[in-house]
């Protein structure tokens, strides 16, 4: 009986150890499928260095990383859209897209639809260019006031803290 419980405890710890590596998501198997399909483990893939890893190292703060990650996710969504008619890898792409959707957009279908709209906007269309330039002031204003307001609040809090400690 003692051996049985010891064996079961060992088996459970082995299973938990494996579930730690496989429990990270169903997308690992699907990524391996895509790697095999595209022959992405071939040594010639390393020529010229990585596409995204080195860039991500330069972005340390979480809010800054989100900016660059949105561009990377956009790239993958475009890549998957370009390959949507390939039935051999369709299932793998669907599972990976779903996992990206959950991780990056917190499962919000509204955010996903907005994200898809943005990545599908053609930049070589004159009418689109004109609309984008027309909205540029609003976009720039949306980018700046929040950060200025945060800086102002931070400096006010610092000033109050110094005055209180004097």
Swiss-Prot record:
The keyword Transit peptide does not apply. Gene3D superfamilies: 1.20.1250.10. InterPro entries: 4_helix_cytokine-like_core, Interferon_gamma. GO terms for molecular function: cytokine activity; type II interferon receptor binding. Released primarily from activated T lymphocytes. Pfam families: IFN-gamma (PF00714). It is found in: Secreted. GO terms for biological process: adaptive immune response; defense response to virus; humoral immune response; positive regulation of autophagy. The modification Pyrrolidone carboxylic acid is found at residue 24. Coiled coil: none annotated. GO terms for cellular component: extracellular space. Homodimer. Interacts with IFNGR1 (via extracellular domain); this interaction promotes IFNGR1 dimerization. This is Interferon gamma. It comes from Capra hircus (Goat).
């Amino acid at each position: 009986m003692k051996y049985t419980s010891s064996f079961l405890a060992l088996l459970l710890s082995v299973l938990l150890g494996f579930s730690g590596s496989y429990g990270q998501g169903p997308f690992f198997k699907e990524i391996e499928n895509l790697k095999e399909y595209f022959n992405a483990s071939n040594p010639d893939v390393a020529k010229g260095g990585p596409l995204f890893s080195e860039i991500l190292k330069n972005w340390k703060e979480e809010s800054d990383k989100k900016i660059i990650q949105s561009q990377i996710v956009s790239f993958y969504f475009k890549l998957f859209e370009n390959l949507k008619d390939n039935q051999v890898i369709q299932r793998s792409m669907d599972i990976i897209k779903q996992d990206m959707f959950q991780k990056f957009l917190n499962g919000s279908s509204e955010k996903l639809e907005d994200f898809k709209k943005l990545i599908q906007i053609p930049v070589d269309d004159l009418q689109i260019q004109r609309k984008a330039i027309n909205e540029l002031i609003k976009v720039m204003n949306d980018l700046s006031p929040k950060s200025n307001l945060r800086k102002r609040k931070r400096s006010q809090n610092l000033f109050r803290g110094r005055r209180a400690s004097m």
